[in-house]
Amino acid sequence: MSKIIGIDLGTTNSCVAVMEGGEPKVIPNPEGNRTTPSVVAFKNEERQVGEVAKRQAITNPNTIMSVKRHMGTDYKVEVEGKDYTPQEISAIILQNLKASAEAYLGETVTKAVITVPAYFNDAERQATKDAGRIAGLEVERIINEPTAAALAYGLEKQDEEQKILVYDLGGGTFDVSILELADGTFEVISTAGDNRLGGDDFDQVIIDHLVAEFKKENNIDLSQDKMALQRLKDAAEKAKKDLSGVTQTQISLPFISAGAAGPLHLELTLTRAKFEELSAGLVERTLEPTRRALKDAGFAPSELDKVILVGGSTRIPAVQEAIKRETGKEPYKGVNPDEVVALGAAVQGGVLTGDVEGVLLLDVTPLSLGIETMGGVFTKLIERNTTIPTSKSQVFSTAADNQPAVDIHVLQGERPMSADNKTLGRFQLTDLPPAPRGIPQIEVTFDIDANGIVNVRAKDLGTSKEQAITIQSSSGLSDEEVERMVQEAEANADADQKRKEEVELRNEADQLVFQTDKVVKDLEGKVDAAEVAKATEAKEALQAAIEKNELEEIRAKKDALQEIVQQLTVKLYEQAQAAAGQAEGAQGAQDAGTKKDNVVDAEFEEVKEDK
């Protein structure tokens, strides 16, 4: 069975892993890094992903970051006259990770397990699945990030019974999950979180501070300057990381703006204490879901065996201190917070292929599901933290006499009124026979699969008429749209490959021109002048083709020149061998006269060295 890769599709960084020899292993990208920035840039119709895209974000306005925050919404970003959905941008990142995996494994990869924040709703999960399809991946399973982290942590500890709290503070989302590990079963007891809280927000408080300080000093608002803002973002991210290891850092941004007197520079020392003061509200926001998850699980903090930190933002000392205070436990530092989620996804891939045995994963739905009933009330059918997959039915009736149809308004959330919850979709059960209110029996059934994706059925028990939908949010993509995007992604991948081949061809041609110059110089006066002239002429023809950028002409002229250079190189070797043969003959005659002395001298030298 072909390999199933595990992908952590993150807000700021992504990571890909695979099972090898019974262990999950992170796959490095072509630059040799184990994580790839979730950044996509467009430049002259060329797409760049990762570090190379992030590096030129300051100068390229067509750079897209943190798109995960828009998954499951109708957000679109316009680039070079074309609108892109979050699914399409995510698919470009996934294609890049898929290519890294294929290069590493030496085989085509078509299947993946992709992780999502535990608190992602149905629309966000569907969007992630669609992104995988657009990237040419069969998404075998969507699993929650904290659950994946627990899988990676617990793979070697299956014989131990443990209660674990996974605290996952990533670049754009926050999740906390409580799990029980016993005999290879990973059971999620409860989960909570905030999909609008992460490392980006910690960067933002530093940016706001820098903007305020600069405005106070120079009366110029840097937040209105797009290029200055990108430089501030880079500086804020670097300062945040620095302050995890040192107590103060220097932020220096020369020529950040200009005033009447000339260029202005931003110079500021940021202390860890100041950063903790600026971000105190964000740290506190992580604790409320932590308390809720513990309460839902029915656990006291003292009952926990381990607290596992996941996500790069958990390196912030104030975050570590807060969770330690809240749980009374020293956080476990035996996992890499940037890689553990991808490793867990790879383990789940191994479970699905049969490479990993004796592991059972029981996850939960993060939010309650139900329908709108009379008076705009939200009636829950499936409570949050219910183990999935699951199915639940309930019988409802009509609200008016002779009602010909019922509207089924499907919702997800925790608030008592429908208007305050997230609409997942609507559908109608029509052609109800005339009957007084309260008489028709309409059974509504919710199914949640192992990916956390919802299917809803409504059935008139009197007539057995049934209507069903797989929930697609208002922002969801139809099958036709996904198929179109798949084809576009494949076409773009082909175009990217073609561009790569073009660059390689030009590089080879340039290298051949350089090599020809060297060979001609070495052969000067040693071969017939006509042959040298022929090589020089072919070289100039290739240079002319390179300047014109005519690819077919470059290829033809390169092949012609290569043949001439090969013939010349053979002559160069023949001459070198002939010269070596002559020198050997002369040396042999000389050695015959002095052989005896040479041997004695060599022996004498060796003995002397040994002493």
Curated annotation (Swiss-Prot):
Source taxon at top rank:
Bacteria
InterPro entries on file: ATPase_NBD, Chaperone_DnaK, Heat_shock_70_CS, HSP70_C_sf, HSP70_peptide-bd_sf, Hsp_70_fam
Conditions for induction: By stress conditions e.g. heat shock.
Q: Acidic residues: which segments have biased composition?
A: 600-611
- Which NCBIfam families does this entry report, sorted A to Z? PRK00290.1, prok_dnaK
Recorded hits in Pfam families, A to Z, give: HSP70 (PF00012)
* Keyword annotations from UniProtKB, A to Z: ATP-binding, Chaperone, Nucleotide-binding, Phosphoprotein, Stress response
UniProt-listed PROSITE patterns: HSP70_1, HSP70_2, HSP70_3
- PANTHER family to which the protein is assigned, alphabetical: HEAT SHOCK PROTEIN 70KDA
Q: Where is the composition biased (Low complexity)?
A: 577-592
Q: Which family does it belong to?
A: Belongs to the heat shock protein 70 family.
Q: Does the keyword rRNA-binding apply?
A: no
Q: What is this protein called?
A: Chaperone protein DnaK
Q: Cross-referenced SUPFAM superfamilies, in alphabetical order?
A: Actin-like ATPase domain, Heat shock protein 70kD (HSP70), C-terminal subdomain, Heat shock protein 70kD (HSP70), peptide-binding domain
Q: Which residues carry this modification: Phosphothreonine?
A: T173
Q: Where is this region: Disordered?
A: 577-611
Functional summary from the UniProt entry: Acts as a chaperone.
Which GO terms of the molecular function aspect are on file? ATP binding; ATP-dependent protein folding chaperone; unfolded protein binding
